[in-house]
Amino acid sequence: MWALCSLLRSATGRTMSQGRTISQGSARRQRPPKDPLRHLRTREKRGPSGSSGGANTVYLQVVAVGSRDAGAALYVFSEFNRYLFNCGEGVQRLMQEHKLKVARLDNIFLTRMHWSNVGGLSGMILTLKETGLPKCVLSGPPQLEKYLEAIKIFSGPLKGIELAVRPHSAPEYKDETMTVYQIPIHSEQRSGKHQPWQSPERPLGRLSPERSSDSESNESEPHLPRGVSQRRGVRDPSLVVAFICKLHLKRGSFLVLKAKELGLPVGTAAIAPIIAAVKDGKSITHEGREILAEELCTPPDPGAAFVVVECPDEGFIQPICENATFQRYQGKADAPVALVVHMAPESVLADSRYQQWMERFGPDTQHLVLNENCASVHNLRSYKIQTQLNLIHPDIFPLLTSFPRKKEGPTLSVPVVQGECLLKYQLRPRREWQRDAIITCNPEEFIDEALQLPNFQESMQEYRRSAQDGPAPAEKRSQYPEIVFLGTGSAVPMKTRNVSATLVNISPDTSLLLDCGEGTFGQLYRHYGDQVDRVLGSLAAVFVSHLHADHHTGLLNILLQRERALASLGKPFHPLLVVAPTQLKAWLQQYHNQCQEVLHHVSMIPAKYLQVGAEISSPAVERLISSLLRTCDLEEFQTCLVRHCRHAFGCALVHTSGWKVVYSGDTMPCEALVQMGKDATLLIHEATLEDGLEEEAVEKTHSTTSQAIRVGMRMNAEFIMLNHFSQRYAKVPLFSPDFNEKVGIAFDHMKVSFGDFPTVPKLIPPLKALFAGDIEEMEERREKRELRQVRAALLSRALTDDLEDGEPQQKRAHTEEPQSKKVRAQ
């Protein structure tokens, strides 16, 4: 054991010495882990809601400005609570990037059951669960509870977090910071006798009515999780919920110096009841003299109110204007409204009725507008990294689109501010706009930063020389197919890598998506800008590999935005072909029943029917498969089951011209994928984890970098693109010794065609120079992990040796004892 301790000490010394050479920060003492329930315990100590005397600091902050790619979302902060108003796709990613702590969210308020408001909610809830948050209160339209049931179809049971749903008809909600009142508002355009729209009793699984007459069989019916209703639902697009939020009274601050001047016993136990009395507004008597509360305290803050209202179209204007609850806060109200947040299009803001309603709040009320006319960069890190990558290769790493404000809004007679990402309005201690946190996107600054990195310019020059000196291609390859990586990260959207989505542009007017994680449309929009409608109009199909949230929760927004794009292009609407596990039907059906009509958007081909040897009993499915092959000009679209979760698929696309693209989805190394992908032109394979984490890869059913490369080599793939990296490799993964001239790594917004295969591996040296600091940190973490593994292995071996050595010694003692006696006897 002494030798073992000595060995461990020497190994530790060597590694720590190396660590300090790489980064002096590694020698720092690690902080103890935080208690995940510390916030809850702090709240319990404060006592009942509203008894704390009011928050000292309260502000609203814009998370998303209402633009087409980001939706509208607000974050409200106090030292006691955190709130989120609306949670569309990408909100979690923005909060993570801009350090708005997700783990502290007490409440989520939803103004409408529309995908632009709830598209990121499923991912947000899963993240809150993982952070250990014990409870989150959700408020909004009546369909909210059914929506939370529906997401269990792909999330599984949401154990470990209590999701308390507050009905829109419930009385006010009160906590330590404020009281929130919900105001249901119904549009004038409600059909019939003003009853919520009833969804048709369409059988579960029949997605496109015009195509579903003979497309179903009993085996294709998806099974819903326990507790998820199969009954038809009641969705009500005519309902929005507005919120009036009233801050609690904040008692005045005790003036210590003034108290000393008046001879009060400051610094003794006797001062406590005096402070309590004057903060409650009571006078006190000291040495025969009456002292008024205002002599010892600053004036109390009665607590301002703010309003969050969504007015989606002109049909809601009159009901909003006539609402009696709003009227109580207008004019000479007892509780003045400091701020009204308007989630409303320009057509609503231009309506004279709505303008008059805004004016009735008075000249001292500020107004914040969130809509598609707001211009703001949200994903700053994404813009930064793309600008720097563009220096290496402008075609493979094209610049992202920036969006100026589209047009001047209507002239209003009230104080109006257009939303910008991270713009703040402080309600307490002083009411004011704060613009210091607003994002500014400065490409010149990003470029200068990259050019000053050690060896970056030299590595770029070396790459360009090697590209010029390399052998000329035997033949010029076509621009198509063109592969655009929209999301290359795994699990959750992060600041530099979004979750899975890859666009395959088969031709200038035909494309398909391989997986469609949350925020896919936003990535498309930032990549293509004003051309996004053209791209959506050319989208022929979507392949969903499996039902994990990071692979399919962007589908609904793609469907809705595609309908809008076809209308703007003047093209006839037709359902989108979706190749997916059958279980996706249950999710689409539930969302259709409770929230929005979406079933008419989809013609679904169960992925199992595209496996080799699959029997297709439905003529309708056969027709859809034929349509898929014809539209995409494919000879074959094949799927196979891969080694991940249940019903997880990979796919292979064989074009009529002969090229073959294979997509792994999520999987461990898989023989079925190797066989399906034989002689592929391009393999896109997940490489979630670095080499050395093979056990973790098995536990999580993913692949390491070298495992993915070996799959491609066994497949005899012409080229391998690695993607789906763990978010621990935020900017760049660790490079494996197995990297060669046939391997490249994918980045978000990277664009490659087959003619780029010789170029992509040559990008690795400048990439290493650009991300040298990140690579050093990852290598340091790997060294520490390897040291822990060596320690554990040596300790285990030493303990085993001790156990094995102990028994023979005892046996020898027993067997040698008689012999020694004989010797002594002689």
UniProtKB/Swiss-Prot annotation:
Tree of life domain: Eukaryota
Where does the transit peptide start and end? 1-16
- Give the span(s) annotated as Disordered: 15-53, 187-231, 798-826
One GO biological process term is: mitochondrial tRNA 3'-end processing
Q: Which residues carry this modification: Phosphoserine?
A: S199, S208, S212, S229, S618, S736
- Residue ranges annotated as compositionally biased, kind Polar residues, are 15-27
Catalyses which reaction(s): Endonucleolytic cleavage of RNA, removing extra 3' nucleotides from tRNA precursor, generating 3' termini of tRNAs. A 3'-hydroxy group is left at the tRNA terminus and a 5'-phosphoryl group is left at the trailer molecule
Could you give one GO CC term from the UniProt record?
mitochondrion
Cofactor section: Zn(2+)
Q: Where in the cell is it found?
A: Mitochondrion; Mitochondrion matrix, Mitochondrion nucleoid; Nucleus
Report quaternary structure and partners: Homodimer. Interacts with PTCD1.
Q: What family is this?
A: Belongs to the RNase Z family.
Q: What does this protein do?
A: Zinc phosphodiesterase, which displays mitochondrial tRNA 3'-processing endonuclease activity. Involved in tRNA maturation, by removing a 3'-trailer from precursor tRNA. Associates with mitochondrial DNA complexes at the nucleoids to initiate RNA processing and ribosome assembly.
Q: What is this protein called?
A: Zinc phosphodiesterase ELAC protein 2
Where is the organism placed in the taxonomic lineage, from the top?
Eukaryota, Metazoa, Chordata, Craniata, Vertebrata
